[in-house]
Amino acid sequence: MTPRPATTRKQRLSTERVLDGAMALADEIGVDAFTIRKLADALETKPMTLYHHVPSKDAIVDGMVDRVFAEIDRPPLELDWKPAMRHRCISAREALARHPWAAPLMESRTSPGPETLGHHDAVLGCLRQGGLSLEMTAHAYALIDSYVYGFALQEANLPATSGDDMAELATSIIDPAPEGAYPHLMEFTAQHVLQHGFDFGAEFEFGLDLILDALEDRA
């Protein structure tokens, strides 16, 4: 097959297509391994061609983070603040699970995009309209997002979270242990982790509800 001319590929490129490719590449290899050259290769173009559409790698990452924020549902206006924030947090966890590289970057950008700013404004509005003071809004937002991002980061880095993979991992760890060693770990693994239906991800909503209940009591 005759290669397409570089000019044709360049005409097909756009900022949106560059960001599409960047998101797909980061989902595949992670953001640490992400480079402009690898992105150019994935888009079948040359690195310098990308700079016709984005000024820098930082600008690409800014756009990627903004896209993740766009995937997160904002707190529904028709709900009270507590169920609205619960809905938003579950949506955030789902978006971060789709993009495991994103959690450490979500609050790192010095040039946040419109989706990022709009999301933060919507969350602050939800908490304030729910009757929380400015001080309690600050406490609530910091606590909630520390939990959401922390859980997402932990979940993304676990070697297994459920099913046969978790059973195989747990067995490989506990089987070589000397008899009688680590009794609490052994009990927890045998009677909880290795039970049918165990899913580490199910812990997310339990912890989230504890946080929201506590905030409601203090609001």
Regions found by a protein language model. Give the residues of each.
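Residues in the recognition helix of alpha-helical DNA-binding motifs
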Residues: 53-54, 140
